[in-house]
Each structure stands twice: as structure tokens, then as C-alpha cells.
Amino acid sequence: QRVIYVNLSVRVFVNEFPPKNEFTVIDYPNVESAPQVIVVGAGPGGLFAALRLIELGLCPIVVERGKDVHSRRKDIARISKEHIVDAESNYSFGEGGAGAYSDGKLFTRSKKRGNVEKILNVFCQHGASPSILSDAHPHIGTDKLPGVIENMRNTILRCGGKVYFETRMD
């Protein structure tokens, strides 16, 4: 018979209320003069890789074949309205990746989940509602997700990284 262990973390508040949906703010350093690392793609993996490189003191250079998240909106609308697909800017290519214009739900099928709390904190730091930290089914929302993605890019730029759109790596 197997023994099941439960690892439980508890925060105790005595004579005070727990803070509502607090999140950890990451202090990203200026990496303008640090060694450069090329990141191909500005989807979720590329954006989070770039932010992690900044945390580690490296300067990310993000190269994305599609357009920025707000310019993509027009191209995606053309797909629905005019049935015209831009091969370089559509649901698959562009800042934010395939999920940028999805329903905004945060979901993974991966069995190797990694540090989900840190990912949610990064989203909160960049404009997502802190409620995603405690929701059973976190949801940023279609209306907010493009702004969150843009804020992530702005953090990369503010810290000295670079982001190039409409640039292929052939």
C-alpha cells in the first residue's frame, strides 16, 4: 500500500485581514549593455523567455515574423470579413502568438507545469487582474490580453531589450 503525502503551505494572519489578491512584482534590471541573446518569436514562450533573460542580466533581442499585437487585429478582422489571410500576420503569427486573440483563458495540457504562480504574477504585473492568482480557471479576457502583451513588450524595451516585428529568420 502506498503512502500519500501532502505538502501544504499556509500563511497566517493574526489580528489582520489577508491582503486581497496580492502579487509579487519582479524588479527587471537595465540590460542595455549586457550580452545579447536572440529570441525567435514573440508568442508566449518568446515573451516569457525575454523577460527571464532580463532577470538573469542578459539583453534579449526578440525577432518576430508577424506584426505587433494591435496591428494584427486588423489582419485578423480581414480574415473574418473579407476571407483574406495575410501569410505573415494572422491567428498564428504575430506578437502574442496564437493565443493573443483567443478567449483569454489560461490553460495548459502540459504535465510539466513549471512555476505557474510566477507566470500568473508576470501577467498581473503587466495588467492582468490579480484575481487570476486565486481563480480556479484563470481568465485574462480577450479585451485585456492585447494590452497585457503590449505591456510585456514595453518592459522588454524599457530594460534595454529590442523587439523587431515583420522580420523573418530565413
Cite the ranges covered by each PLM segment:
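Residues forming the flavin
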Residues: 1-170
